[in-house]
């Protein structure tokens, strides 16, 4: 676990590459009604609306992930092309504690192994926190020139892309580092979720 001094050093080494302030709004009938798009090649961040067509035909989760990926790629897109996306999406019952498994997110991308579109799911807190932050899906496209982190602060209504030059590269180490870095205090650590590749 990182010490407070080392966390301060890590944060001090960050440079802000992109920032988006957004209006927080409530989830309606299971939908936040927008997605978050981040392009790491040109450091752009924007929100996109969730249309009635998306909700009717694709519901959420895997459907949203596939829809968003299909809109971004073409038949020639390879797994390591900047055009490929990693899409993390949640469904309309995500975050409802009455249903087991409602904390799942679906990840959709072009696979390096099969060279075809794949989806996988993961549990944890990220999907509900993404929903409660105001987004039904997160699209990450492009290739960063250096190691970066994406911070979605649902309490403040802010998304940032920051350089991360000193952080550990191993997922089991960077998770606790980032939790320590972005939690306000010990109690707030429960409100931080880290996804890493």
Regions found by a protein language model. Give the residues of each.
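N-terminal export/ancillary region detector
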Residues: 1-197
